[in-house]
Amino acid sequence: FNQKIKKVIVAVPERAIGSSFKKTKLSEYGYFADWDYNEDNNLCTPGGDEKKVRAFKNFMENKSETILICTHATLRFAFNQLDVSVFNETLVAIDEFHHVSSAIENRLGEVLNALMQKTNAHIVAMTGSYFRGDSLPVLLPKDEIKFTKVTYNYYEQLNGYTFLKSLGIGYHFYQGRY
């Protein structure tokens, strides 16, 4: 891994998303590493939260394990049972980042804040829409400036798809406070 990263955690909002991840030979396309992980570390499978939290904790303790895939909920529950320092030298990628909020009662936002303030973890924030649907900010301005924004328009993104059969794009307009 680069930049002294020893572990990667990918957190997705739903099991269906994470369970669709497959091993991929990225090195064939010029990347320095393949997407290759221990399938036991894909926690986006049916089963109870306690078992998944235990597996998450075991992953963090095992120096030879490097990639874990879990839901936002598993990340939140496991975070409650771990010392924040175990996330040092870890890349935490949060898919559907607009689920985060700077509001005090947003648990995913609290986890993110602790990672940013108390560790050297790298954060990758991924979302197709930075819009939450309410008036709460995803991040406070002091935190947002810490991120490097990478934006692709639909045409740039679609050029990367090889097997896309169809795509539907909808627009929704809101009035008043949302």
What is each model feature region?
Residues 1:
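Walker A/P-loop
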Residues 20-28, 92, 107-114, 138-139:
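Alpha-helical scaffold elements adjacent to nucleotide-binding pockets in ATP/GTP-utilizing enzyme cores
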Residues 72-74, 83-124:
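SF2 helicase catalytic motif II
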Residues 4-36, 74:
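Conserved Walker A/P-loop ATP-binding site and its immediately adjacent core
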Residues 12, 94, 127:
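Short beta-strand/turn micro-motifs composed of small residues
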Residues 15-18, 73-76, 98-99, 128-133:
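Conserved nucleotide-binding/hydrolysis micro-motifs of P-loop NTPases
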Residues 30-77:
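Inter-Walker segment of RecA-like/P-loop motor cores
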Residues 122, 133-178:
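Interdomain helical connector at the RecA1-RecA2 junction of SF1/SF2 helicase-like NTPases
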